[in-house]
Design a protein with these regions (language model features):
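Intrinsic-disorder/low-complexity detector
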Residues: 1-65
Length: 65
């Protein structure tokens, strides 16, 4: 466990942090684009999803999960 993982866990451990993570998940990972989405839109959303996933991974590692 690294210092940055601990920092992420601490930052997102409270009620506000959990609410922010849930919101980020809702607007990225759980978002569905329509059939008419452009390649640019798909790439942009995937980048956002990867960032949220990275944050969640660091939080989990910081918690020792």
């Amino acid at each position: 466990m690294t210092d940055i993982e601990l920092a992420y866990a601490k930052t997102f451990s409270g009620a506000s942090g959990q609410r922010v993570l849930a919101h980020l998940r809702q607007i990225t990972i759980e978002r569905v684009l329509g059939a008419n989405a452009t390649e640019s839109e798909l790439r942009s959303l995937e980048s956002q999803r990867m960032l949220v996933h990275q944050i969640e991974t660091l939080v989990s590692r910081g918690r020792g999960e």
